[in-house]
Amino acid sequence: IDEADRLLGQSFQEWVSTLLDALEPHGPSDRLCAPPRLWTESDTWARDDIQVPQPSVQKLLFSATLSRDPAKISALRLRDPQFIRVRDGAEQGQFALPSSLHQHMLICPTNEKVLHLLHMLHGDQHIRQALCFTKSVDAANRLVHLLLFFEEAWAQATAQPPLHIHFYSSDLRTSERKQLLRAFERGQVDVLVCSDLIARGIDLPDVRHVISYDVPVDMAKYVHRVGRTARAGRVGDAWSLVEEQEVYHFKRMLSEAGQLEHIQRHKVHSGAFDPLLPHYKAALARLAQLYSQQR
């Protein structure tokens, strides 16, 4: 069972009890039968009259943040459970992240957050193959419109092709989600903006960057976001755009998880936004016009 903690936290039409009932052995109880190795060739009468119990299943649960709640774990009817944690030898803390993951933090005023993101896409970092997470579907939708308006203005002014930016959310049909993920895997999508729906249980092998446009509220959500990159030994980068009023909470969260020392802080000098500003203002005006028409 992958993403075990998420599945345990939701009923999903009582899937746990339904599955486990189907997996239970149907033979006699272990307490009433001798193990198979005790039978001999002469014990044909015993073989005919007494059934050897069928073997039970082996249950393997995988998650980056597996629950330790006894009530939830007991629902799985585990026998002699063993807990195995995989991490780097020197790593401490409750959460383990791969050594090939590079974590970055940019502290910015709220009104400059989009400019910081645009600078990451068109500045020195030149970020592509990125997942960009927002706090909600509405926030993701608004950000995508703003980025698309900017790309259109930027392409007209610079004669450069616009970035391919798309919106991924629970509002899309399943077929549309699959089509969008295939396009990302083929390199046809530069930035995929989404809420936390995609952060768990979806395997995208070529995610180079994860951007938390809105920082997560807890460490478990942070781990599942950044876990979309640096997979299977690949190198990946996780970027967090932290508003000034969020710095204390964000740094404390990382510190308690033993990750603060691994994060690199970046600072963008004020003049770096100058080439972006005219096109950003034009995009803002178009966004305001769009939302005024929808009211």
Indicate residue ranges for each PLM-predicted region:
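Post-DEXD/H (motif II) to motif III coupling segment of the RecA-like Helicase ATP-binding lobe
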Residues: I1, D5-E91
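Walker B catalytic acidic pair
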Residues: E3-A4, W15, S136, S195, ...
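Arginine-glycine-biased low-complexity disordered regions
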Residues: P25, D49, Q54-S56, H122-I127, ...
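Short regulatory helix/loop adjacent to the ATP-binding pocket of P-loop NTPases
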Residues: D69-R79, Q94, V144, L197, ...
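Conserved interdomain hinge at the start of the Helicase C-terminal
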Residues: L97-A155
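Conserved helicase motor
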Residues: F133-D138, I165-K178, S195-R200, E243
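SF2 helicase motor core recognition
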Residues: V193-V210, H224-R234
